[in-house]
Amino acid sequence: MEHTPAAPTGQLHAVLVLAGSSGGIGTHVRSLAQGLSAHGLEVTVCGPAETDELYGFSGSGARFQPVEITPTPGPRTDAAAVGELRRAFARASLVHAHGLRAALLSDLALRTARAGTPLVVTSHHANLATGVERRLLRLMERRVAKNADLILGASSDLVARARSLGAADARLGPVAAPPLPAATAERSREAVRKELLGSKERADRPVVLAVGRLVPQKNFHLLLDAASGWRGGEEPLVLIAGEGPEQGALRGRIKSEKLRARLLGRRSDVRELLLAADLVVISSRWEARSLVAQEALRAGVPLVATAVGGLPELVGDAAVLVPPGDPTALAAAVSAVLADEGRRAELAAAGPVQAETWPDEAATVAQVLSVYDELTGER
């Protein structure tokens, strides 16, 4: 869709929009807000109030404007959100929406208030819904794809999907993982493991770590299916860090099936969890550029993951990939890696090497700046 850039006012003003987020989208927007502000742009971030509490947009050099963009459509909530976005877009040189809900409402707000303002959309997720919901989401995706000036896909499959839905311009826009936060205190692997394992577990018990929202996309039930096949003295302890709507069901399975697994809840000490882990597992139905995968490989922790979405291109040969939805294959891969010290050492060494091939936060910000320049003709 052709747009005439907004009249320049000296300083380029980028408005970043997101819906509720407790994962990679919020982290990425925080990184962009900080990087763009450092390059001299005026940056406004629009999203639910809790996202500022989680990610500290206000402390990134950006102005934060609360806009309650709900996870699901609602006539009243959407109308209110569109009204707030119209006001936030009043001086915008460009709007950059992250995710489908944010993109749809941003498009509506621009069409009724600032039709000449370019719209960039970063696509972070695949449509994994079924039935009527899938068809409705596809209609929304098609509208966004056709109306946005540019779609940036976090993985190659998302770029291909945007093009199939009618996007005139769709490009790869990798989402870089931020550096792992510094440890709050220097603790040894043994000290962290002792805290996590407790007094009832052997000190050398293998630890399998999984991190993410407890939602169907992450498919932690597949990990529990695999864990049900690990019995005996070398059975690993599965630690799952995260929170979400599937928490009750997962906890119920762990208890009823007597699985050697534990839910840790939301954690901010991923660096220490990685220090304690012998292996990281991603059991997802789909991922783009998984932050957990990036963190594991950077930290030199062996990774076993499902071969879905953007994961194969992200990890290359530095991780073990298994078919999605196959608990037997997942269980076998985990057991094989845990049983082979040499293989673990190979994967641990390959991870940081693979990570060197990824764009860092500075490169990601530079790409976005280039896109903004192209669409606005400024700077």
Q: Positions of the model-derived regions?
A:
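A conserved mid-protein helix/loop that constitutes part of the nucleotide-sugar donor-binding site
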Residues: 26-34, 206, 210-229, 245-251, ...
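Aromatic "clamp/platform" in nucleotide-sugar-dependent glycosyltransferases that forms part
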Residues: 285
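Conserved acidic donor-binding segment of nucleotide-sugar-dependent glycosyltransferases
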Residues: 317-328, 336-342
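Short His-centered aromatic/hydrophobic patch
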Residues: 97-103, 123
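A short, active-site helix/loop in glycosyltransferases that binds the activated sugar's phosphate group
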Residues: 148-172, 179
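Nucleotide-activated donor-binding/catalytic signature segment of Leloir-type glycosyltransferases, i.e.
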Residues: 251-267
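N-terminal strand-loop element at the rim of the active site
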Residues: 11, 15-79, 158-163, 244-245
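Short hydrophobic beta-strand element within catalytic cores of glycosyltransferases
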Residues: 302-305
